[in-house]
């Protein structure tokens, strides 16, 4: 069975590659807006929207839709549109607790089964000096993604501790993906 990742995100695709899950990326290009104010419902609604849109682009297989946001002081921190917004997100995160929420939606086009859930990871941040914020923005070419935090590079130095899924912070909680796959009575070996 073919797996389609409803995203052109190189980060998400690399995660699937790292855990040896064959897949094909499809560009769903949906407007990331939700009517939900609850962050958990928000990410699940957008993940479902992406998966459903992806389902209109192929005729069979599995469609995986994902949406990740950072929640800080009870507010959703969206992907920054400018480098200044990315800097501001880092300033707010300094010496703070943040939650990374990912909505995950899996559709089996062969059986018409669909499951949607979310994963939450709590992150405690170290102090981030203005000099280090500028250094990070200068070095990190992908700073305009995932609320400005690219944990695999310099931003990893800013993290004091993580409670929950590391892969969730990267945008694809493989543990939750596996759980949804098992709900469909499928195994990793079923994906080709």
Residue spans for each PLM region:
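ATP-grasp fold ATP-binding core
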Residues: 64-69, 152
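Mobile beta-alpha loop/short-helix "lid" or hinge segments that flank ligand
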Residues: 20-25, 30, 105-112, 143-156
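GST superfamily/GST-like fold recognition
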Residues: 1-15, 120-192
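Residue-level signal for inorganic ion chemistry
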Residues: 16, 47, 67, 86, ...
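Conserved core of the sugar-phosphate nucleotidyltransferase
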Residues: 90-139
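N-terminal polybasic phosphate/anion-binding patch
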Residues: 1-62, 75-76, 131, 182-192
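Short beta-strand-to-turn element immediately C-terminal to the catalytic PLP-Schiff-base lysine
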Residues: 71, 107, 159-161
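Active-site-adjacent loop/tail segments of enzyme domains
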Residues: 42, 68-98, 125
């Amino acid at each position: 069975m073919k797996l389609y990742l409803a995203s052109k995100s190189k980060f998400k695709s690399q995660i699937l590659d790292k855990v040896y899950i064959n897949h094909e990326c499809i560009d769903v290009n949906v407007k990331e807006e939700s009517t939900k104010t609850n962050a958990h419902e928000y990410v699940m609604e957008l993940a479902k929207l992406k998966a459903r849109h992806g389902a209109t682009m192929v005729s069979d297989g599995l469609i995986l839709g994902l949406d990740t946001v950072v929640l800080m002081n009870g507010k959703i921190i969206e992907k920054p549109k400018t480098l200044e917004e990315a800097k501001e997100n880092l300033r707010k995160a300094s010496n703070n607790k943040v939650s990374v929420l990912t909505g995950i939606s899996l559709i089996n086009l062969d059986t018409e089964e669909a499951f949607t859930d979310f994963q939450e990871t709590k992150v405690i941040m170290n102090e981030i000096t203005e000099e280090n914020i500028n250094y990070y923005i200068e070095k990190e070419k992908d700073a305009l993604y995932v609320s400005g935090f690219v944990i695999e590079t310099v931003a990893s130095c800013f993290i004091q501790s993580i409670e929950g899924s590391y892969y969730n912070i990267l945008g694809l909680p493989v543990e939750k993906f596996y759980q949804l796959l098992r709900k469909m009575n499928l195994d990793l070996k079923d994906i080709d």
